[in-house]
């Protein structure tokens, strides 16, 4: 009975971690879109208006990933850096967060997504 409960507990824990990873990956879809839009906004020759428009769209796209990142964090607290970094974009330019977000999403998309 104890062995069965231990195995059941381990299986349930791994299911939760899988769900957290799925949520983190879902969030990273928005992160990647936002980073691509931010990169487009940095191209030479854009008007200031077009640059601001792309940056605004990038921020909006990034913030769409907040709920999935929060869901991942609720299941597995090790995804808190992803959620926190996304939320920082409201105060810190996305360009300054790009390296951290890219690294976190690389981890989420890896075969061994552990922080």
What are these regions (language model features)?
Residues 16-18:
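Bacterial signal peptide processing site
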């Amino acid at each position: 009975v104890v062995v069965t409960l231990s195995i059941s507990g381990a299986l349930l824990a791994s299911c939760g971690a899988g769900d957290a990873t799925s949520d983190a990956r879902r969030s990273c879809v928005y992160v990647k879109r936002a980073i691509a839009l931010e990169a487009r906004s940095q191209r030479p020759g854009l008007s200031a208006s077009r640059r601001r428009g792309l940056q605004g769209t990038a921020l909006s796209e990034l913030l769409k990933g907040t709920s999935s990142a929060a869901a991942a964090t609720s299941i597995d607290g090790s995804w808190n850096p992803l959620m926190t970094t996304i939320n920082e974009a409201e105060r810190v330019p996305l360009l300054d967060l790009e390296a951290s977000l890219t690294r976190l999403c690389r981890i989420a998309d890896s075969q061994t997504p552990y922080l």
